[in-house]
Amino acid sequence: MTPIILLDDLQKFIEENTKDILLEVRTRTGTDTEKERAAKVYKMGLPEKDDTTQQIPYILLKVLTGADEQEERQPKSGEVRVRMMIATYSQDGEQGPLALLNIILRIRERLQKQHIIGGRFCLKYPFEYIIYQDTTPPYYLGEIMTRWSIPTIEREVKKLWQ
């Protein structure tokens, strides 16, 4: 459950810290839909598979790996890797990648300032991000790779030899 709680806390944190960045939205001809909005934040997958380009702009949070370790004479530690996939749209070949970079740098700045999310998940380094150079305009994609230390599960069984 802990990685799911991390995703929930990250979703709230990112929504709160990016809500003022309005991004271009692709509109269908003849519709009266919004032309700008903040990126929507999703966990593990987009809600409608057939309409992925209509979801843009978005930030998709995905747990990639998790591990619990205990080195000799050390307390247990847990770690989860989370990938944040960011997609933006723009007809302007300069503004699209800049909007993408702006979102990535905002998330980077706010996460590194706060460092702890939900009172229990600690950001670890390295903090990595990439802007994909081979994306097809008018869609621009990038991602952030993060590592988080997470609480571990403790044994509930009492030691018999005590």
What residues fall within each predicted segment?
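Small/polar-rich, solvent-exposed N-terminal microdomains that initiate assembly or binding
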Residues: 1-71, 159-162
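Catalytic micro-motifs at enzyme active sites that drive phosphoryl/nucleotidyl and oxygen chemistry
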Residues: 48, 67-74, 127-137
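Generic internal hydrophobic packing segments that stabilize the cores of diverse globular domains
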Residues: 58, 81, 100-104
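Active-site-adjacent structural patch at catalytic or cofactor/ligand-binding sites
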Residues: 61-91
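Acidic-leaning, charged glycine-interspersed low-complexity segments
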Residues: 98-162
